[in-house]
A protein has these predicted regions:
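N-terminal start-of-chain detector that recognizes signal peptides
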Residues: 1-5, 49-52
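Amphipathic, interaction-prone secondary-structure segments
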Residues: 2, 7-28
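Extended interaction-bearing regions that mediate binding to partners or small molecules
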Residues: 1-2, 24, 35, 45
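Acidic, low-complexity intrinsically disordered segments
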Residues: 31, 36-82
Length: 82
């Protein structure tokens, strides 16, 4: 499993990231509201579009690897299940 997050824009109110799962398409959008301190998937990527558990997993990785690391410009998360 692989996720790719890339910052699209940042303001004093929110940070917007493009993201994808298992591809480099960056076809989804995740928004983090700085005032409310919460993240949500604004537009799911193709792999998450019809699967609520996939969206929850992608959002968890966004929070753990992007938000907790002070919003890097680009972040790739890779998990190898054996």
């Amino acid at each position: 499993m692989r996720w790719l997050f890339e910052r699209k824009s940042e303001s004093t109110k929110r940070v917007i990231y493009r993201y994808s799962r298992d591809s480099n398409d960056l076809d989804g959008l995740v928004v983090y509201d700085k005032r409310m301190e919460e993240a949500f998937i604004y537009e799911p990527c193709v792999e998450d579009r019809y699967s609520y558990p996939n969206r929850k997993e992608s959002l968890a990785h966004f929070i753990n690897y992007v938000v907790e690391r002070s919003f890097p410009e680009r972040k790739k998360v890779v998990f190898v299940y054996r």
